[in-house]
């Protein structure tokens, strides 16, 4: 009998805050008023969504894929840390670096704002990992024009190696 798929959310676990770390590629920013609202939400309702992480077995740490700001609330507010006994609800996914970057962007696209420089660096990193523009478009929900603009920001000619020459570039 074929085993059915089980979403990671059904395996949420309590992880010590000290074992959770930020990733280096999240371009999502939350303004101070929204952070205060997130604090109030967690204070009043508790954690209603787990922080999505990738487990780095070699370092015994959980790297955040989604939920960085929920993590920051526990890290920066002693009352929340104490109430939760320093334990953060975590849902673990096992994906490659490129897939984790894409997942972070997908989780963030509908909320917050994105730092354009960080987004262009992410597109550059994915390109350097061998991801095609079509892959980036599909997995990050970006148009070809948006990818092109973000590549232009980095100014790295290597990112255009798969592009055909256009007279408009002259």
Which sequence ranges carry the predicted segments?
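Alpha-helical interaction elements
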Residues: 85, 110-170
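Short, charged/polar connector segments at secondary-structure boundaries
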Residues: 1-91, 138, 148-149, 159-161
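Short, charged/polar surface micro-motifs in flexible loops or helix N-caps
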Residues: 70-71, 96-98
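Short coil/turn linker and secondary-structure boundary residues
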Residues: 15, 30-33, 93-96, 114, ...
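Generic beta-strand or strand-like secondary-structure segments
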Residues: 72-76, 104, 122
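Short, Lys/Arg-enriched N-terminal segment that forms or immediately precedes the first helix
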Residues: 100-112
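Exposed alpha-helical structural elements
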Residues: 34-37, 100, 122, 146
């Amino acid at each position: 009998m074929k085993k059915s798929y089980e979403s990671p959310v059904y395996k949420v676990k309590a992880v010590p805050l000290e074992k959770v770390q930020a990733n280096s590629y999240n371009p999502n920013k939350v303004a101070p008023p929204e952070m205060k609202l997130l604090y109030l939400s967690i204070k009043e309702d508790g954690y209603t969504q787990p922080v999505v992480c990738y487990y780095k077995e070699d370092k015994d740490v959980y790297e955040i894929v989604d939920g960085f700001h929920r993590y920051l609330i526990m890290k920066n507010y002693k009352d929340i840390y104490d109430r939760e006994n320093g334990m953060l609800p975590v849902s673990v996914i096992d994906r490659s670096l490129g897939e984790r970057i894409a997942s972070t962007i997908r989780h963030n696209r509908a909320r917050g704002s994105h730092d354009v420089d960080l987004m262009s660096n992410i597109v550059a990193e994915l390109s350097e990992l061998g991801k095609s523009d079509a892959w980036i478009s599909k997995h990050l929900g970006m148009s070809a024009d948006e990818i092109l603009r973000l590549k232009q920001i980095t100014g790295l000619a290597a990112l255009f190696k798969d592009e055909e020459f256009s007279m408009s570039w002259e």
